[in-house]
């Protein structure tokens, strides 16, 4: 026989510290927690093997291909500061292992089997470097930031949104009424909640019709372009596209999808439809915390954000840094830049393990949403800058005078913050003062300031470096 059968150590084949990474390799950084007694090199090599060409033994068909051409390689291992049992393993994958334009296939390979691997106590994918050669096989976001601004004719400020609440139980007509009030008051967008699909109390077609009516009415009264994220997420891809087609026929500007529960295949199909038909696509990340919240196991959200930019979406929820949901500031800003910018430098202080070059793939607007209200406006304006969507659900609808005044309060607060920033004032230091000044001539804002002056969601973030 030309080979020796039996179980052999992965590190003999898959640990190659002298390997020079290629410009076309997909690079991954894994946080590896090996079982006691498993050396880090063996664990890192095992990850490289099991997520590429390896299996647990030598097989005779290995001789029919060139392992050197196709194998993943663990090319560097470093300890994690402050964690004795954890290591960062860097793995390089040859580009030929992946189908072009398929996020689904990329994830099936890189995070498919290997996460259940016995020799590892835990495994987390911290970051991916997508090479330009692979990026170029994706359409990416249907439109991107600049095209969206041109479609909406809104420049020089963040966009304002609001999720309609109560999220489940309203009839379509009452739902449309709530949409109209918010848009008339000064918001740019309203949003279907992620779990509003087509339930017995409100079927999707009724909702689409009433929301569109609300949108056109608000548009004609305010002279501004308005949008409502019509959630097209459905149980089958065919049904999802049917809903998107109906939205296009109604002439609305934007639809929405839950990309993790819907899946990357469905999401990419919808993104292609949206580009072909001039619809913007808002992406909600329902289920992300199942995957990304544990510090030592799962996939970090920055990887899910990169995957979404490849699969396609014009907006994606990305934490607030200040509200009720998870998000450490530097880490959040790291993946916000990954979503918006063309070229992002490696920066370990922001959790960025690799330099990412998107080669002019359109950008995605980060959406800050979850437990935010008018007092957060200066911080949000400073942290996220102009290219973002700030979404106040309860922070609009919870206004004591109703939805429209709640919308007015948010719009006034935003315009005041943008003006103050443009005049050179420091929003971080003078934020409260700016909001107070503005509330003197806006009774709606004054009422909002009063009701939310004490609300805080202060817990330590789990997602620290």
UniProtKB/Swiss-Prot annotation:
Site (Transition state stabilizer) residue list: 324
Record-linked PROSITE patterns: RUBISCO_LARGE
Protein known as: Ribulose bisphosphate carboxylase large chain
Cofactor: Mg(2+)
Note on how the cofactor is bound: Binds 1 Mg(2+) ion per subunit.
BP GO annotations: photorespiration; reductive pentose-phosphate cycle
Pfam families tied to this protein: RuBisCO_large (PF00016), RuBisCO_large_N (PF02788)
Function: RuBisCO catalyzes two reactions: the carboxylation of D-ribulose 1,5-bisphosphate, the primary event in carbon dioxide fixation, as well as the oxidative fragmentation of the pentose substrate in the photorespiration process. Both reactions occur simultaneously and in competition at the same active site.
GO cellular component: chloroplast
Keyword Metal-binding: yes
Principal localisation: plastid
Organism: Cornus oblonga
Subunit structure: Heterohexadecamer of 8 large chains and 8 small chains; disulfide-linked. The disulfide link is formed within the large subunit homodimers.
NCBIfam families: PRK04208.1
Gene3D superfamilies noted in UniProt: Ribulose bisphosphate carboxylase, large subunit, C-terminal domain (3.20.20.110), RuBisCO large subunit, N-terminal domain (3.30.70.150)
Reactions catalysed: 2 (2R)-3-phosphoglycerate + 2 H(+) = D-ribulose 1,5-bisphosphate + CO2 + H2O; D-ribulose 1,5-bisphosphate + O2 = 2-phosphoglycolate + (2R)-3-phosphoglycerate + 2 H(+)
Lineage: Eukaryota, Viridiplantae, Streptophyta, Embryophyta, Tracheophyta
């Amino acid at each position: 026989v030309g080979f020796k059968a039996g179980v052999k150590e992965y590190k003999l084949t898959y640990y190659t510290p002298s390997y020079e990474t290629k410009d076309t390799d997909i690079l991954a950084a894994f946080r590896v927690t090996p079982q006691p007694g498993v050396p880090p090199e063996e664990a890192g090599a095992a990850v490289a093997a099991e997520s590429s060409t390896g299996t647990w033994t030598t097989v005779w068909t290995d001789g029919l291909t060139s392992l050197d051409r196709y194998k993943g390689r663990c090319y560097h291992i470093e300890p994690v500061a402050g964690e004795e049992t954890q290591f960062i393993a860097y793995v390089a994958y040859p580009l030929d292992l992946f189908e072009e334009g398929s996020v689904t296939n990329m994830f099936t390979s890189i995070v498919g089997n290997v996460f259940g691997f016995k020799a590892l106590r835990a495994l987390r994918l911290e970051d991916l470097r997508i090479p330009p050669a692979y990026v170029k096989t994706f359409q990416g976001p249907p439109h991107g930031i600049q095209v969206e601004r041109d479609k909406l004719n809104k420049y020089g400020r963040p966009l304002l949104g609001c999720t309609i609440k109560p999220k489940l139980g309203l009839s379509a007509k009452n739902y449309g009424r709530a949409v109209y009030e918010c848009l008339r008051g000064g918001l740019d967008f309203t949003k279907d909640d992620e779990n509003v699909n087509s339930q017995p109390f409100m079927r999707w077609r009724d909702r689409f019709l009433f929301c569109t009516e609300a949108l056109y009415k608000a548009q004609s009264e305010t002279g501004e372009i308005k949008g409502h994220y019509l959630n097209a997420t459905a149980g089958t891809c065919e049904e999802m596209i049917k809903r998107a087609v109906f939205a296009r026929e109604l002439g609305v500007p934007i639809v929405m999808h839950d990309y993790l529960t819907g899946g990357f295949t469905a999401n990419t199909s919808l993104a292609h439809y949206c580009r072909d038909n001039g619809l913007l696509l808002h992406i909600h990340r329902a289920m992300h915390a199942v995957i990304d919240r544990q510090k030592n196991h799962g996939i970090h959200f920055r990887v899910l954000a990169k995957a979404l930019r490849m699969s396609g979406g014009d907006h994606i929820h990305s934490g607030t840094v200040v509200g009720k949901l998870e998000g450490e500031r530097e880490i959040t800003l790291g993946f916000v830049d990954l979503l918006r910018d063309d070229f992002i430098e490696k920066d370990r202080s922001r959790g960025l393990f690799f330099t990412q070059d998107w080669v002019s793939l359109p950008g995605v607007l980060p959406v800050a949403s979850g437990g935010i209200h008018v007092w957060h406006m200066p911080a949000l304006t400073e942290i996220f800058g102009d290219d973002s969507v700030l979404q106040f659900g309860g922070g609009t609808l919870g206004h004591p005078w109703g939805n429209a005044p709640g919308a007015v309060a948010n719009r006034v607060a935003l315009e005041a913050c943008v003006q103050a920033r443009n005049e050179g004032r420091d929003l971080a230091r003078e934020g409260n003062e700016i909001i107070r000044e503005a509330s003197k001539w806006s009774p709606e804002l004054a009422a909002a300031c009063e009701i939310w002056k004490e609300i805080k969601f202060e817990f330590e973030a789990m997602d620290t470096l």
